[in-house]
Amino acid sequence: MSGTGCFPAGEMAAVARVCRDGAAAARLKTGSLLAILVASAVGICLPVALTGAFRGKAGYARGLLLVKCYAAGVILSTSLVHVLPDAHAALADCAVATRRPWRDFPFAGLFSLVGALLALLVDLSASSHLEAHGHHQHAEEGESPPPPPPTHQPYAPIPTTKKSPVFELSGEMSPKKRAHSDDTDRDDVALFGAKSAVRSDEVVVAPRVGCHGHHDVVEVGEEGGGGEEEEARRKQKMVSKVLEIGIVFHSVIIGVTMGMSQDVCAIRPLVVALSFHQVFEGMGLGGCIAQAGFGIATVGYMCVMFSVTTPLGILLGMAIFHMTGYDDSSPNALIIEGLLGSLSSGILVYMALVDLISLDFFHNKMMSSSNKLKKVSYVALVLGSASMSILALWA
């Protein structure tokens, strides 16, 4: 897929004579269109179909989390083991590396960094847009804005929970209970932020002290749950969309590069490897789409887009070659391939580490409540990374 490297002139000529066969390459690429299309469709539709079949059943949430962790490993391995090394090899080819400025600076790493920063910018912009849209929607529905932070009052309510230590008549806890409560709250705040000091399964009971000394008990534990859940769903939808952009971008590069190639020795194993590649990558994207809760039309559109992108890229590459006689081993072709591949790698690394692995392992209530689930999820992450990395032996 990338440059051939610095080989002696005689060896390079012999390899070129044996492997470069335009007619055989065209037949292989034409046959690969259906295989890659089916593999892509199976990979992305399988998690979506299983989600529809098992939604609401016992173990569904944990199963979906494991699929997502496996998917994160696949995407991380795709970016670091497949995309970035190919991009670096293209820019390190003798036809490119002997020219300036390509020999003076590691452009593969630079553009990978640019890709990650661009993904962060898109993430921040989308988050700000969703936040503003949410406030605007609340205003249209006539809902009151969130209350301002409470100020100090001499008779402020004392929030307690049904599981909290019992207050003595004096309003203070015993030293032993106070130390235990302080340690627990401190750990919760350190791990999950200030809002997590009260667990989601607890109902906050706030004794509202009135002017006449009586107490009105108000339960407020369930008020903010719907808004937080809706915000999490919006975030997941945004993650899925940005992730699909990065994967589709990468798939176009793969398809166009393969379509322009006339090297039969490279195309033959590449067809098999790309088929497995699309299955695993599709499972990764499909798991994220399934968790985001899109409508049927949006899910169908995203599945179709992923399925047809690589075959369309192959057709585009074949068309470019036949119309222009474009040489896939020319310096300009290698530079374009290397820069676009590096950019795509940075996007995928950011999405895997920040929007998938970090969210699941450090900000997921279900994950934080079970050490066994953490271990199994980590194993799923490693298996996803390993399954995709093994394919680097052939592609």
From Swiss-Prot:
Bias type Basic and acidic residues, positions: 132-141
Chief place of localization: membrane
One Pfam family in the UniProt entry: Zip
Membrane association type: Multi-pass membrane protein
Cytoplasmic side: 85-104, 263-269, 322-333
Keyword S-adenosyl-L-methionine recorded: no
Example GO BP: zinc ion transmembrane transport
Region named Disordered: 132-163
Keyword flag Translocase: no
Subcellular localization, as worded in the UniProt entry: Cell membrane
Gene Ontology MF: a single term: zinc ion transmembrane transporter activity
InterPro entries: ZIP (IPR003689), Zn/Fe_permease_fun/pln (IPR004698)
Transmembrane region(s): 34-54, 64-84, 105-125, 242-262, 270-290, 301-321, 334-354, 375-395
A single GO cellular-component term on record: plasma membrane
Coiled coil segments of this chain: none
Extracellular side: 55-63, 126-241, 291-300, 355-374
Protein keywords: Cell membrane, Ion transport, Membrane, Signal, Transmembrane, Transmembrane helix, Transport, Zinc, Zinc transport
Domain of life: Eukaryota
Role, per record: Zinc transporter that may be involved in zinc uptake from the rhizosphere.
Family stated for the protein in its record: Belongs to the ZIP transporter (TC 2.A.5) family.
Protein name according to UniProt: Zinc transporter 6
